Amino acid sequence: MTKQKEKRGRRWPWFVAVCVVATLRLFVFSNYVVEGKSMMPTLESGNLLIVNKLSYDIGPIRRFDIIVFHANKKEDYVKRVIGLPGDRIAYKNDILYVNGKKVDEPYLRPYKQKLLDGRLTGDFTLEEVTGKTRVPPGCIFVLGDNRLSSWDSRHFGFVKINQIVGKVDFRYWPFKQFAFQF
């Protein structure tokens, strides 16, 4: 075999690898950088995330999933899913009620313990903040984990399901905070 054929033979696997990575990046996974404090303490500004774009083509959106969605033409936001289509949402005395039943939010406990009065979320009903009694079909209701400082569905309303980029699969930076579970 000539040296030229050997070189071509070594380039082929690299070409295939680059094509596979580019395809995965374009259609399956995306990198995101967290900007701001709205998802603290779960996610912090500067965290690097991998978002699975196919998650909701394969399975359903679940309450408490952390998602990335197109907020407008220029910005994507990362928030937590609180309300699914058909849900009635309310907060009273810092407790989440979905369809009239208390729902525990264990991911907020560490943050609540740091607060002076232990209260993270002000009282509201879905109707008070959106004018609707239920989350409409084809929409979700999202909140940031830092409820005191988050621009979320309480301010901009429902997120259409077709605005969702994907589900946050894991945080890979900083490496000491590497996590699959949120």
From Swiss-Prot:
It is a single-pass type II membrane protein. Its main location: membrane. One of its GO terms (cellular component) is plasma membrane. GO terms for molecular function: serine-type endopeptidase activity. This is Signal peptidase I. It is found in: Cell membrane. The chain crosses the membrane at residues 14-30. Residues 31-182 are extracellular. It comes from Bacillus caldolyticus. It catalyses: Cleavage of hydrophobic, N-terminal signal or leader sequences from secreted and periplasmic proteins. It comes from the Bacteria.
